[in-house]
Amino acid sequence: RDDVESRGLGDVYKRQDNVISNMNFWERILYLLQEYGTSYLKGAGTTLVIALVSTAIGCLIGFIVGIIQTIPEDKQRDSLLKKIVLKIVKIILKIYVEVFRGTPMIVQAVFIYYGAAQIFNIQMGMWQSAFLIVSINTGAYMAESVRGGIISVDPGQTEGAKAIGMTHVQTMTNVILPQAFRNILPQIGNNLIINIKDTSV
């Protein structure tokens, strides 16, 4: 049966090749649109959904990681335990950023999709895997963008906020992050474009 089906499909492909070979360029384009136009539109829609959702999730991850990386260490007020925990968390986040920025997305996709099933016995669907992989990858890139955006804000503004009694969280939300967000907007657009192209992986 398989041989019959394969021969049948082979005959269909041969007939299509013969038909297409006798067409000029524009006729071929029109023929492909008529035959596969619905598939192209479906694929484009899937690409946009994955890229938009994953970029949004990746930005959220990037903001969280970037903010944690820029938390200052208060040597006088912070307890020893808090210093140790913060240092360990920063090291883990730095490893995450370096690994996901330094390896190709195809390698990450293979490791997460197949590795999760083999190591943790977790079976993920294609959509779940796509969102997870692109989001985590985007988060690593956005983390550095957020960190750079926060650092680029004049340190005098942080000192001024602390001088009037603002906590670190208040300083970030009211003074630093609004300016940092404006600085990293172009990078968010760049990551969206990259994700649109990288969904082919």
Sequence positions of predicted segments:
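Transmembrane alpha-helices and adjacent helix-loop boundaries
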Residues: D11-V201
